[in-house]
Curated annotation (Swiss-Prot):
This is NH(3)-dependent NAD(+) synthetase. It catalyses: deamido-NAD(+) + NH4(+) + ATP = AMP + diphosphate + NAD(+) + H(+). ATP binds at G40, L41, S42, G43, G44, I45, D46, S47, T142, K171, S193. The gene is nadE. One of its GO terms (cellular component) is cytoplasm. It holds the Pfam family NAD_synthase. It comes from Sulfurisphaera tokodaii (strain DSM 16993 / JCM 10545 / NBRC 100140 / 7) (Sulfolobus tokodaii). It is an enzyme of class 6 (ligase). The lineage of its organism: Archaea, Thermoproteota, Thermoprotei, Sulfolobales, Sulfolobaceae. Belongs to the NAD synthetase family.
Length: 279
């Protein structure tokens, strides 16, 4: 459960949040000397919210729908609703990636659903960057703070993007923002799922609902509370609190660039402190 104390802390002025993110997307595209942004739309809350924000930031946006046989038909229908909301009927491509996945899996003789699921995410990343390079667009990521902290994304898959506009909003906050933006209720309330295999749900894999997950993340990593206190506040077992904390710790490598072994006086990762937009 989410304590009322945490809910109040996470409830923001979503009008201001919208204005800020839209402005930053627009600025970042300009600073990057790109002409627009491209996004992968799944029909889930994160990609729906980010697509709407992108469409408000620039008229130069493009959307890719990249389903597989494990993609629920409802997700495709929901994605089309968002495309209609952003007037993107002439700004999207529908690419079924089953043939690519099957060929890849056959070549390397893979049947493990998790490995194949990660291949799906990386194929989508490759397609997004192919279109982005062709159009001189940025790849707009859709990950939220909860997923990023938990490491609940594929390294160099859905984590392979140029910018993460909602990356500092917990899943609970993204749902609130979705309500503010007019995202259809069935999308806001839909159980989050990467849909990398049939029946997959994020909350089912993790073993907790996102309101509880977000409460644990907030209380531990923003208020630095002890696990015992967090368990009491969230009415959650101590073991589950520790599980969430450990997910953050063990996924740290996903949030960092590759390690560089220092051999000189100035190693790039540890000593390279130039601005992101340089020159």
């Amino acid at each position: 459960m989410m304590p009322e104390y945490v809910r109040k802390k996470l409830t923001l002025d979503f009008g201001q949040v919208t204005d800020y993110i839209v402005r930053r997307i627009r600025e970042y595209i300009e600073e990057s000397k790109k002409e627009g942004g491209i996004i992968g739309l799944s029909g889930g809350i994160d990609s729906s919210v980010t697509t709407i924000l992108l469409s408000r930031a620039t008229n130069n946006f493009y959307i890719l729908l990249m389903p597989t046989s494990s993609t629920p038909q409802k997700d495709i229908e929901d994605a089309m609703k968002i495309i209609k909301i952003v007037n993107g009927e002439n700004k999207y491509s529908y690419i079924n990636i089953d043939e690519i996945i099957n060929e890849f899996s056959s070549i390397v003789n893979i049947s493990d659903k998790i490995v194949i699921g990660n291949i799906k995410a990386r194929v989508r990343m490759t397609l997004l960057y192919a279109f982005a390079q062709k159009m001189n667009y940025l790849v707009i990521g859709t990950g939220d703070k909860s997923e990023i902290m938990l490491g609940y994304f594929t390294k160099y898959g859905d984590g392979g993007v140029d910018v993460l506009p909602i990356g500092d909003l917990y899943k609970t906050q993204v749902r609130m923002l979705g309500n503010y933006l007019g995202v259809p209720e069935e999308i806001v309330k839909k159980p989050p799922s990467p849909a990398l295999w049939e029946g997959q749900t994020a909350e089912g894999e993790i073993g907790l609902d996102y309101e509880t997950i977000d409460s644990i993340l907030y209380l531990k990593f923003e208020e630095m509370r002890e696990p015992e206190e967090i368990a009491e506040m969230t009415k959650t077992s101590y073991d589950k609190v520790i599980k969430i904390i450990n997910m953050v710790k063990t996924s740290q490598h996903k949030r960092l660039p590759p390690e560089i072994f220092r051999l000189s006086g100035r190693a790039i990762n540890s000593d390279w402190r130039y601005p992101r937009q340089w020159g």
